[in-house]
Amino acid sequence: MSLFDDNPGPREEVGDSQDLADASESPSADALSPLASDPISCVAIHPGAAHPLASHLPEDLRITWSWPHLLLFVVYAVVSQFAIGIAVLAYYSTNGHLSQRQIRRLFESDPRLIVGTNVLWFGLIILFLYVTLSVLPCLPFWRSLGWKRLDANPLTGKGRPWMYFLSGSGLSLFVIGASSRVKNAEHVPIQEMFKSRSGAMLLLCMAVLVAPMVEETVFRGYLYPVFAGIASRLAQSFGMDSPSAIRAGVVTSILVTGALFGLMHAPQLGWTWGLVGLLILVGIIFTFARAWTGTVFASFLLHLGYNSMLAFLTVLGTKGFTYMPPHR
């Protein structure tokens, strides 16, 4: 399974000449219609009933899933996170003989537990997407979720990969400067992780090695195109022509996906709305890069540069994890 599979395997051949004729008359239908082997996609888009908007959609928005799969994904994400919490609670209650209050404190302050449960949850989410979007319909996983090569073209404003990485690093410096003006920004829950050397190291490893790929796959690879498609169809239902409806859908999805990205981090920030607002802005910028370039790789590089700069400054500020912030 290649990260940049620009030559996906052939789709299932159509059985009779009439179907072949129909496919030739409507080339976009093949790109959007689900395969019979994927029951989730079959519920999402009925075969042979391609939406009139389909022929106008850019290639990176032609996906095999729609709102039914999105609903199933949300349910799965919530249930899996709840199941992980129940499993941890049962383990510590039985083997650790801890009270619920002590366990709750562990969830808030134990870096190994916090990072471990988050990585496990990320893994379960990627597994769900892999099975339902790649294994069942026999499609390339990464390409289906928008991971394609980044074609640099200065004439169209699409830079080289290192430009996105450095832009993400610069964005993190802006956010750090803006955060310094937010009241009580230093008392948010995530700061608890930086009171110990192990906590800071685990968090930064996850932030650089895990979070950019997983979060970009979910937000910019999975959520962005489905929200854009739904919003485009809704806009067209209100009388917009197809190109205008698609533009409206893309803008709406950029804003919605960015807002969800910021809100997902809100508990870590103690729902400090100044900080949450900055993360929403960051999410919007990441999604705009994905929409502009047509590939998740661009937003991934922004995200990687952003988190890498934060990690570098943390290592610098703690003198290589030899000086940790005092407990308050």
Q: Which role fits each region the language model picked out?
A:
Residues 1-159, 173-180, 305-328:
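N-terminal, membrane-interfacial amphipathic/helix-forming hydrophobic leader that caps
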Residues 65-73, 110, 114-118, 122, ...:
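Residue-level signature of transmembrane alpha-helical entry/exit and packing/kink sites
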Residues 82, 172-328:
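Transmembrane helix-loop-helix hairpins at the membrane interface
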Residues 155-167, 171, 211:
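Alpha-helical transmembrane segments of multi-pass membrane proteins
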